[in-house]
Amino acid sequence: MALRDAIATPEGKQTYVRRLFATIADRYDLITVLLSYGQDRRWKQRLVAMASPRQGMRAVDLATGTGDIAFSLAEAGASVVGVDVTHRMIELANAKARHLSGGPFFLVGDMIALPLAGDSFDLVTAGYGLRNVPDLRAAIDEIHRVLHAGGTMLSLDFNRPESPILRAVYLAYLNVTGAVLGWLLHRDPDTYRYIPASIRNYPGAAGVARMLEAQGFDRVEYTPVLLGLMAIHIARKKS
C-alpha cells in the first residue's frame, strides 16, 4: 500500500504512526537532530523558555519521545508527566530518568484519550506531536480538558510554508533526505517520507491557531521558526 493511502484515514494513520515510531524509537534522538538541521535541541529549549516553567508547576509533555522537553521542564522545578503512545519511547525515557532524582514520571498514553484527570495541569507541551495524531480536534480537546482554567499549552512542530515555491522545495528536500536516511538506517526509504506526507495533510500554523481558538483557547499565537519551516504555538485555556 502506498504511504499516501496508508495515512488517508484516521484509523490508517493511527496504525501507521504507531508502527513507525515503534520502528524508529532507538534512533529517534539521532533522526530529530538530522532532520532539524542540528537545531532540534535549540528549538525545544526555546519552547521551554516560552513556557516559563517554575517550582511547583504541574506540567504534562505529550509525544514526549525520549523525554527531552520533559527533562528540561523538570530541571526548572516543574512536576512533570511525560506521555507517549510508543512503549519503546517510554522505556528509553525511563532509562534516562534512572540517573536523575526528581525527574519526570513517564507513562504510555494516547494524545486523543489521555489517561489523566481533567483540570489537573498548569502546562501542556508537545514536540512534534499534533501533526501525528489521527484526529487533531480530539487531541486539542484533550489538551483543553487536562489543563486548569488559565493554563497554557505550547506545541513545536513542522509547518507547511505559505509560499508555494518554498513549500515545494521544503517538501522535496524532506522527501529526498527522508528516503536516504530511511534506507541507511532501516533499509526502507519510506520510513521518513512520512514526515513530508504528514505535512501535506497538516493545516499549517495558521490553521492550527484557528482550531485552538475554536476549541476554547484564547491568546493564541504562533512563532515561525527557520523561515516558517517550523512553528511554535502558544495558547491559554480560557478562565
What positions do the PLM features span?
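Class I SAM-dependent methyltransferase SAM/SAH-binding core
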Residues: 58-113
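A short glycine-rich, Lys/Arg-flanked "PGG" loop and its adjoining helix->strand segment in the class I
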Residues: 137-152
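Conserved alpha-helix/loop element of class I SAM-dependent methyltransferases that forms part
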Residues: 27-30, 36-57
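Hydrophobic beta-strand segment of the Class I
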Residues: 28, 124-125
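Core SAM-dependent methyltransferase catalytic element
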Residues: 209, 216-239
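A short acidic, Gly/Pro-enriched loop at the edge of an enzyme's catalytic core
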Residues: 112-123
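C-terminal alpha-helical "lid/dimerization" subdomain adjacent to the S-adenosyl-L-methionine
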Residues: 16, 156-211, 215, 221
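N-terminal auxiliary segments of SAM/dcSAM-dependent transferases
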Residues: 1-19
